[in-house]
Curated annotation (Swiss-Prot):
One of its GO terms (biological process) is defense response to bacterium. It is found in: Secreted. The keyword Secreted applies. Expressed by the skin glands. Belongs to the frog skin active peptide (FSAP) family. Phylloseptin subfamily. One of its GO terms (cellular component) is extracellular region. The modification Phenylalanine amide is found at residue 19. This is Phylloseptin-N4.
Length: 19
């Protein structure tokens, strides 16, 4: 499960770049 956390953070970071 912990390995999914960096992926989630990376996804949020990528989405934030659009805004």
């Amino acid at each position: 499960f912990l390995s999914l956390i960096p992926h989630a953070i990376n996804a949020v970071s990528a989405i934030a770049k659009h805004f």
